Design a protein with these regions (language model features):
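The conserved beta1-alpha1 loop
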Residues: 136-137, 299
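Glycine/Thr-rich phosphate-binding loops of Rossmann-like dinucleotide-binding domains
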Residues: 11-13, 58-59, 142-144, 243, ...
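Hydrophobic beta-strand anchors of alpha/beta hydrolase catalytic cores
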Residues: 131-135, 169
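Serine-hydrolase catalytic-loop signature spanning alpha/beta hydrolases and amidase-signature enzymes
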Residues: 140-142, 169
């Protein structure tokens, strides 16, 4: 027999099943509205360990056995769920905090059904409108049951942190048309947001912001060249010029970046010589004059995935055009922040940035005055 993990792509329920290879018979080990992972089987017994989690329940360890488990039932501290015994019950302290609830948002773009995840505070004051941050990369909805551990950010918003501080967070799925990656993101994200506003009346459509990192950072930069719908945006490690990015390398490996545009994620589908206009229209830097949305960029000078100069090109272009833009550079850091102190610093600055534009908070000094390289503290 073998053990397989089952997953429902519509409801996002999951579980483990034991299948007899001779008869085809299937036996349920565990299945339900939660995320099942970290599976282990006993070496000499038909007994299994695994974890289950939901947005409101931290990953806990469970035990299931096809053998006699009456000995486990004698332990009062063990809770039984669907014939599996819960061995741990961790993170009870979260009951003291405002925690997210998650809702599936169904919408359509390019004639296809898409899904997105909307996180909101479990309870909020009646009549109080919520600001919303839209985070995106490509597809995310399969993570419906993922527990969101609060932690300093390496590059993206922490859902639990922002929801506990009075925000809604929406994460839409995106599909792409080759040659039109930026336009595809724009359409899918806007369609998802339209549906959110129809369903969740607490969202303030005048206080919505964007956030993305890497490929998500590129899409963020593209969106603000095409729409003024969003009050502010934060782009991490964004490609801004597909021509110069195509001709660059991944500094961490020395790998050419050309394949990415011709064949994979960047989805242009041609070389610049055969698809000049596609490269131009999908490059945010050439439309920087259209930007009215305040933008925060993070791009680190030791980024081995997206050339640091991509963030610099976008920042310098927007500065020259006197647009509202800020750039964070963590010297020596990579594509995503590694040092905890830097992660904490970024988390604070992202919160202050979004609070200023979406919650009418005071403008922090670093946004009001800036800081030159010479003024940055030197590590000892």
């Amino acid at each position: 027999s073998i053990t397989v993990r089952a997953f429902n792509t519509q409801t996002k329920s999951s579980g483990f099943h034991k299948i007899d290879l001779l008869t085809g018979d299937s036996k349920v080990i565990s299945q339900g509205e939660s995320k099942h992972s970290r599976y282990l089987r006993a070496k000499d017994a038909d007994t299994y360990l695994f974890t289950k989690e939901t947005i409101r329940s931290s990953p806990n360890l469970f035990c299931f056995s096809f053998l006699d488990s009456s000995n486990l039932e004698t332990h009062d501290f063990l809770k039984k769920q669907n014939n599996a015994f819960e061995l741990t019950d961790i993170n009870l302290q979260q009951d003291s905090f405002v925690w997210p609830k998650v809702q599936m948002i169904n919408y359509r773009a390019f004639g296809q059904k898409l899904q997105g995840l909307l996180y909101t505070p479990l309870a909020s004051s009646i009549g109080v409108k919520l600001p919303m941050i839209i985070y995106f990369y490509e597809r995310y909805s399969d993570r419906f049951h993922d527990y969101k551990t609060p932690a300093p950010s390496a590059s993206t918003i922490n859902v639990s942190w922002f929801v506990s501080n009075g925000y809604a967070v929406f994460i839409p799925d995106i599909i792409y048309k080759v040659g039109r990656p930026g336009e595809s993101a724009l359409k899918c994200i806007n369609k998802g947001v339209d549906q959110v506003l129809k369903i969740e009346k607490r969202i303030d459509q005048k206080r919505m912001g964007l956030q993305g990192q890497s490929w998500g950072g590129y899409q963020t930069a593209f969106l603000i060249t095409r729409t003024n719908r969003y009050a502010c945006a934060m782009a991490g490690a964004p490609v801004s010029n597909m021509f110069s990015a195509y001709g660059g390398i991944r500094y961490s490996s020395g790998m050419s970046r050309q394949f990415q545009y011709e064949k994979t994620q960047s989805r242009i589908g041609k070389t610049p010589w055969k698809g000049f206009y596609s490269y131009k229209k999908n490059s945010p830097v050439f439309y920087a004059n259209k930007v009215n949305t305040p933008l925060l960029i993070m791009h680190n000078d030791n980024d081995g995935a997206v050339p640091f100069t991509q963030g610099v090109e976008l920042f310098m272009g927007l500065r020259r055009l006197e647009k509202p833009v800020w750039m964070l550079v963590y010297n020596g850091e990579q594509h995503n922040l590694r040092k905890r102190a830097n992660r904490l610093d970024l988390s604070i600055r992202m919160s202050e940035f979004f609070d200023y534009y979406l919650k009418n908070s005071l403008k922090p000094d670093w946004m009001a005055k800036g800081r030159s390289l010479k003024e940055k503290p030197t590590e000892k």
